[in-house]
Amino acid sequence: LAIRIAALLAAACFLGVALGLRAITGDWSGSGWLAQYSGTALYASMVYAGVILVAPRVSAAWAGVIATVFCWTVEAAQLTGIPAELSARNILVRAALGVHFDWADILWYPVGIVPLVVVDWLLIEPWRRVQPADPERTPSHHA
């Protein structure tokens, strides 16, 4: 449960940083280079946190692979035009799916994911390995 709470808080922090950068720069459209690329990296960071939230026992490396492939899949879907059409109707869908394909985004997703994989691998994964998979099913030594 602690890992899931930490992942949820991390995702909220990444969203806060993204919105804060847009507020500071005044670039709410995301068209400027800072808003666009930081937003792409922070989106990928939120996806990584989402992977940990859904599957807290997954290794850092696999969480990174899953998050990167998810981001690349969403980016590739933008080539179909479907995300753009859905985004025109809802700002939350626009934030989640984007509007148009950008090769630079393909490179910026790992920028948001790789540092989290390293931190997870060095600091959290060793702790995660010593925790019981299901505390309620772990035999108790209490009488």
Predicted regions and their residues:
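Short, intrinsically disordered terminal tails adjacent to the first/last structured region
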Residues: V130-A143
